[in-house]
Amino acid sequence: VLDDNLDEVRQMEKKMGTADKGRMDQYLTSVREAEIRTRRADDWLDTPLPQISDSDRKRTNRKVNKAQAGDYFRTVYDLMVLAFQTDVTRVATFSLGGEGDAFAIPEIGITESRHQLSHHGGDEGYMEKLTNYDTFAIEQYSYFLSRLEETKDLNGKPLLGSTMSLFGSGMSYGHSHGNANLPLV
């Protein structure tokens, strides 16, 4: 668009004052930047997906029962890594479960939901289970970060170096619904 009209623009600029030329330059720069972004987006749509290794394909091609929380979490994290690796997306969100319905983790002996455990009332058994639950969740997140570090992007660099990741909770102290000083990594 800009190139097709550049001669006409240059003729107009000869009649403009300094301030108007500055505004015109800002406008033309904005148009050029929009053209570049549009061209880049069009090119991206036609870019074939890269090949993935058989080990990555097997890692993400499995039926996972939510009762096996570790397998479930790692599968979702693997899918996120694969999406970043192949540049299918640059944004992903994963909730381990809502504050009110995060599921039990029977594989480590936790039959209560996280929400139920957070209302521990000072019960040491519940508090220990809550600690174990959170430890388990952060171990799964650590798995995700490790996968980002060991997986290369399209330029051959670790994905972790070009990824911003946030892990946290909407409650700092669930027993009283405290939401100040939220625990975030």
PLM features per residue range, with description:
Residues 1-185:
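Ligand-binding pockets and gating/stacking loops
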